[in-house]
Regions:
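Short glycine/serine/threonine-rich phosphate/pyrophosphate-binding segments
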Residues: 43, 65-70, 91, 121
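ATP/NTP phosphate-donor binding region
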Residues: 1-58, 103-107
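Glycine-rich beta-alpha junction loops
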Residues: 7, 128-130, 140-146, 199-202, ...
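Internal helical hairpin/lid segments
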Residues: 192-237, 243
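ATP/nucleoside-binding phosphotransfer catalytic cores, i.e., glycine-rich phosphate-binding loops
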Residues: 14, 184, 215, 225-294
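Glycine-rich beta-strand-to-loop/alpha-helix junction loops that act as flexible
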Residues: 7, 61-63, 84-86, 200
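Catalytic core of DAGKc-family lipid kinases
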Residues: 2, 28, 37, 75-80, ...
Length: 294
């Protein structure tokens, strides 16, 4: 069993949990190989190498970013996967039925591996115009949230969560609808929007139910679009995302498709909260692309 650890997950709180997590995983009766990594690129490379070397299972200890790196290695393979939610955002793990308690999740994963038990779930596969391919488990953001993330990642001050808060204020001041072309199972939709999300799972950003009806076992992607929304309306609607009630707003539209093409100028998408491919991209729901240890 290969176990990817992220020293910065949950602002470092995982360090104190790690011995207990390893004890929980040990009920599987398998040797455990730790895959520490000091960067996202190293984490992804370590996971790919472990799978290529014949790992019997891959476990990721961390948040959605750590899970995202691990998915690039196990997607579309027979190697079972277990996410242990120990980050600031654990949307994929929670949306796919793992307990919020990391220790309980570790025991669940260990017992499933011991008993030879796994459950298939869908993943989303994204392809850019240059042929680059990425997988994601939760949600792709391709509108205001992606733009805010892009600005926050360029900022050197302030550090910590306040950088993201400042990026929100800056981008709210610059908010304008952008022209998108969506192609849903081949059917084109040209529209102006400030927010576009494509979900395999319901939540992103640490529990915001952006695609509240998404189901990672139905073979479909849920698309949620906020149209020509002004600053005041966006600020008022944003808190409703936590309950998923934003989809009842008259300027919010929802779609469902197996394949989704998203095109717009000047936007880099974010998948599972991680910087991903520049638009345009084509996203496909891949049924049973992942075996979960639960």
């Amino acid at each position: 069993m290969a176990v990817l650890t992220n020293p910065t997950a949950g602002r470092g709180r995982y360090r104190a949990l790690l011995p207990g997590l390893l004890d929980g995983l040990a009920v599987a009766g398998r040797p455990i190989r730790l895959l520490p990594a000091s960067s996202p690129a190293e984490a992804e490379a370590a996971c790919r190498a472990a799978v290529a070397d014949g790992a019997g299972a891959l476990v990721a200890v961390g948040g959605d970013g750590t899970v995202h790196r691990a998915l690039q290695a196990v997607a579309g393979t027979d190697v079972p996967f277990g996410p242990i939610p120990a980050g600031t955002g654990n949307d994929f793990a929670l949306d796919t039925g793992f307990p919020a308690d990391p220790l309980a999740a570790a025991v669940m994963i260990g017992e499933a591996l011991r008993d030879g038990r796994s459950r298939p779930v869908d993943l989303a596969r994204m392809v850019g115009v240059d042929g680059a391919e990425r997988w994601y488990g939760a949600v792709l953001a391709a509108g205001f949230d992606a733009i805010v993330n892009e600005r926050a990642n360029r900022m050197r001050w302030p550090r910590g969560p306040r950088r993201y808060d400042l990026a929100i204020l800056v981008e709210l001041a610059r908010l304008r609808p952008r022209r998108y072309t969506l192609r849903l199972d081949g059917v084109p939709h040209d529209l102006d929007a400030v927010l576009v999300a494509v979900g395999n799972c319901p939540t992103y950003g640490g529990g915001m139910r952006i695609c509240p009806d998404a189901d990672p076992t139905d073979g479909l992607l849920d698309v949620v679009v906020a149209g020509r929304v002004n600053r005041r309306t966006l600020v008022r609607v944003k808190p409703r995302i936590y309950q998923g009630t934003h989809v009842s707003h008259p300027l919010v539209r929802s779609f469902r498709a197996r394949t989704v093409e998203v095109a717009a100028e000047g936007i880099t998408s974010y998948a599972d909260g991680e910087r991903s491919l520049a638009l345009p991209v084509t996203i496909s729901a891949v049924p049973a692309a992942l075996r979960l240890l639960r």
